[in-house]
């Protein structure tokens, strides 16, 4: 008599991983992908690139940002190859000389996206294939303070509606069109406003990095209901810097403390008034700003764009990247 095959509990079966559009990698797995890419930055250079309150060091650059610079170098090369194929297809009409490779960097206030953008600029400019790398922040496309006040938007500064989104999209579109020279407004964190009569000039870089809270936001429909082209439609690659909301809040408050002891001391600083009250009063203001402006903007507008990124960097409580998710091709 043949004995019946015992049933195997469902939990004992090997579970097939759920299919996702991303390849998920641990820090060690990602770090191994740098291959033999040399580290072109010194500790002093990293220190200068690091944002206030950020803890990026040479190990973080070596483990996280070197592999990313290698990946981006491969993307740029592949794009050049595709451009050559397109020129071959177009024949006599295929005289494209190439347009800048555009990278978007998004994430919350205080999450460290500005440091990520500066590191990428420094690392990518060391590759001989693309030495000219420009970095533009979306702060320059905030509406001037006078305009924000007139529209009742000062308490919404940083929300999508506080930007001149049409001008920002046009700026990147002109870069992508290959225009010889494109200009952008300049923002000053000291005066908390656009600097009058000052422009940033961008002249056909190999790579353009666009960094800001809302760079991955989809375009709003026009008044006629038609879908518009959005800023992110011009990106060749995008990075979202992610972390737990509680950690970002703690980093934000720590950064505010340090700014109060340094930059806010400048007599020209918009925030100097917070150096003339007690630390607890100043921190109460910072907590209120987080609770009423930065956190709602993160939850409503910034975090929902995470799924649009090519690469998601997930930071732990110590500001170090722990996991990464890379979109499949």
Swiss-Prot record:
Pathway the protein contributes to: Cofactor biosynthesis; coenzyme A biosynthesis; CoA from (R)-pantothenate: step 1/5
Keywords associated with the record: ATP-binding, Coenzyme A biosynthesis, Cytoplasm, Kinase, Nucleotide-binding, Transferase
Keyword Cell membrane on entry: no
Annotated Pfam families: PRK
Region (Disordered): 1-21
SUPFAM superfamilies: P-loop containing nucleoside triphosphate hydrolases
HAMAP family: Pantothen_kinase_1 (MF_00215)
Name of the protein: Pantothenate kinase
Species of origin: Streptomyces coelicolor (strain ATCC BAA-471 / A3(2) / M145)
